[in-house]
Amino acid sequence: MQAATSRESYRIAGDRLDAYVRGAEPSAVAATADELLSVADLIRREPRLRRALADPARSGADRAALLTGILSGKVGADALDLSTTLVAGRWSAPSELLDGAERLGVAALLAAADKAGDLGEVEDELFRFGQVVAGQSALSNALSDPAAPVEQRATLAGELLTGKARPVTVRLVEVALGGFGGRSFVGALTRLVELAADRRDRQVAYVTVAAPLGEEEERRLGASLSAIYGREVSVKQSVDPEVLGGVSVRVGSDLYDGTVLRRLNETRNALAKR
């Protein structure tokens, strides 16, 4: 968890991003997002720069000037403004600055999809791609292999997604392949799905069933969960025949396991203790 000073610095940059997004076209926001992510990549690649940009002994203006000297002429005015706003804040550790830079780029991508009216679809495409990867061990290994260059894995993902997913989705998958927030590829995809849902003011419910829920069943389940959590719920289904029946629902750290498999396991455990 980030320290309070880092959270406040990110909040200030996030507010500036929101103000920019309100007056910009979706395509412009997407282009700015890509530049913000390139800045995050630079901060990741250059540990000395990362330390300098988070150095509490330097003033915010000095840190912003340092980054301006590096980025001038290489990114647009909006990306430069947002990046310098970010580094001008106080950061408790260089790693937290990197995390903030990555999140700002992702937030801009999601904002671009939101302005274009595509955010719900992007959320679903990210989840479905994660399901495809999880269902194919060879593909999962290829995309998660830390020994393979990110560019190589991104090319593979791009070949799979081109023509089947929106450009913002493809770019977010690339972010996940880069280990967004220090996570594994699968963990990063999951977090991106949750961030997309959160921008739509929704909570994600991961539902595991033996056979797909019908549209009306899914709607009723979503409505019930919304009543419990006090906000709209985005239901994400995974089909696993091994659960045999019933339903398992995970929302955040809450798990509701009503599967037949769980009940059978409980029965076996009870019998084994006799």
UniProtKB/Swiss-Prot annotation:
GO terms for cellular component: plasma membrane; proton-transporting ATP synthase complex. Its main location: membrane. InterPro entries: ATP_synth_OSCP/delta_N_sf, ATPase_OSCP/dsu. The keyword Transcription does not apply. Gene3D superfamilies: N-terminal domain of the delta subunit of the F1F0-ATP synthase. It is a peripheral membrane protein. Keywords: ATP synthesis, Cell membrane, CF(1), Hydrogen ion transport, Ion transport, Membrane, Transport. Disulfide bonds: none annotated. It is found in: Cell membrane. It comes from the Bacteria. Belongs to the ATPase delta chain family. F-type ATPases have 2 components, F(1) - the catalytic core - and F(0) - the membrane proton channel. F(1) has five subunits: alpha(3), beta(3), gamma(1), delta(1), epsilon(1). F(0) has three main subunits: a(1), b(2) and c(10-14). The alpha and beta chains form an alternating ring which encloses part of the gamma chain. F(1) is attached to F(0) by a central stalk formed by the gamma and epsilon chains, while a peripheral stalk is formed by the delta and b chains. PANTHER family: ATP SYNTHASE DELTA CHAIN (PTHR11910). This is ATP synthase subunit delta. It comes from Salinispora arenicola (strain CNS-205).
